[in-house]
Amino acid sequence: MSSPEAACYSTPEEAGLHLEPLPFERIPHQTRLFLDYLRDPVALRRFYPNAVRFHHELAARAPEVLAAHRTERNALCAALGALNTDWGAGAETLDNIERLRAPDCVAVVSGQQIGLFTGPLYTIYKALTAVKLAGCLSQRGTTAVPVFWLATEDHDWAEVQTAEVIACDGRLADISLPADLHTDGTPVGRVVLDEKINDTVQRLFDVLPASEFTDDLKALVRDAYAPSRTYAAACARLMTALVKAYGLILLDPLDARLKQLAAPLYTEAARRAPEIAAAIEARCRELEGADYHAQV
């Protein structure tokens, strides 16, 4: 996390940025709860007890998070090291995995469904946000590393089989994988790409405008989205290539080693299922009583 780009700037001006904000109020279909949270997250602590107004305030929660941590760190980091090495991770990522072994290190976790060519652009934004926040916390004295959770266990193939890109004519173009590549009941991360992926990659570059970056980008995409590779590995490999310099740790929850580490959590959740369901129902009633919509 020593890269200057991981530093925590106090203001956009200090970062050399000129911002022209687009308020979410101007974007259709936003929920009232979301907009109220953006305006004043602290006012919603009834529903979000750990809400903060400024990101640097999160450091105060580190002792609580560390005290609640139960996973065996060495086993966790061994699994993460093996996964990220397979995906082509750089020294920065492997160094961060070693940092995570320390009992005083916290993880800043973001995540998103895996998708064709990484999916929507905000997937990359989410990943870089974790990098920036981990850098901010580390700079202020809380050891932190960025982690990105690849949501490989999702079963909704229709949501992740298509990528939308801006074509040469300035319009949106859809690039899709075949529907029959996925079998009902199979996590999308376990879908295995076949030879047709080469045609899909070619269609992408047929519609994209050419630039000085085309050859390099084509090499990255063809290396990641290759026949016989799982959808999880393809997405992970491309994301790794794109953000390799920033130390981002990728996590695939389908990995058997990680599932074994999570077994006690699943056992506890199953044991307390009635209690959890009752708590969710009670919170939904509270939200609706405050003129918000139920979240689940």
Predicted regions, residues:
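N-terminal targeting/trafficking signals and adjacent low-complexity tails
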Residues: 1-296
